[in-house]
Amino acid sequence: MSSIPISQEGYRLMKKELENLKKQRPEVSEAIRLAREEGDLRENGGYHAARERQGMMEARINFIEGRIARYNVIDMKALGGEKISFGATVELEDVESGEKKRYTLLGPDETGFCKGSVSILSPVGLALLGKTPGDDVVIMVPRGRVEYEILSIEFNGPAIDVTE
């Protein structure tokens, strides 16, 4: 089983999601119990909805617990260097159109928390890893092949875009 890189903030948010899901267990169990009391389960929409919710919730809990066991928590403040790696914020310019893009490379489980991030395991992330400013990189995207020039690399940590 290979490890999965994640920032300290991403790890904290995943642990918080797990904690919140576990807190919902009694509520879902109570909804199932109350629906059972209504009688015939074959035509009991409330019962089936509560069981479905319970199944999805337990699947997500199992997924997160499995991932947490594999996480390699990375201190974003300790990152740096001249080459693109986990935690780098990269500015790119489309060689053809001149359009500029900015991405932060993070682990696959935290890109949803961080606006402007891509997974290091995505086609974009994999194409950028190990490159330096001035390098050109070809990335396959849904619209085809796009060539970018790497303009700059920064290691400032992710801008987690979440409200708590």
Positions of the model-derived regions?
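Short, exposed beta-strand "edge-strand" segments with a Pro/Gly-rich flavor and a Y/T-containing core
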Residues: 1-6, 71, 116, 121
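Generic detector of short, locally flexible boundary/turn motifs and exposed helical patches
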Residues: 13-14, 20-21, 53-59, 68-70, ...
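Non-DNA-binding regulatory cores of transcription-related proteins
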Residues: 74-157
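N-terminal cationic and glycine-rich segments that engage phosphates or anionic surfaces
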Residues: 1-59, 161-164
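Short amphipathic alpha-helical segments, especially helix-boundary/capping motifs
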Residues: 5-10, 64-66, 102
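Conserved, well-folded catalytic cores of nucleic-acid-processing
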Residues: 17, 21-24, 31, 35, ...
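Internal alpha/beta loop-helix hairpins
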Residues: 45-78, 82
